[in-house]
Amino acid sequence: MIPKVLVPIAHGFEEIEATCPIDLLRRAEVEVLIASCESKLEVCGRSGIVIRADQFLRESDLIQFDLLVLPGGPAVF
């Protein structure tokens, strides 16, 4: 079974804390889903880089994931 990882992102997230794990996990053929905590799928990170999430966090069935990767940033305070 292929592991599944959820990466929720919110406005102001630290891009490197999201993109590096996503890249490495996908290279390892792990299924990674990016979920927006915002009202839009496009989420702007701390440095102005915009990431398009796969779906909204509210639509995610958390029980189906093996791991959560939680990027930091001003949005987490």
Mark where each language-model region is.
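Extended, subdomain-level signal for the structured scaffold at the beginning of enzyme domains
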Residues: 1-77
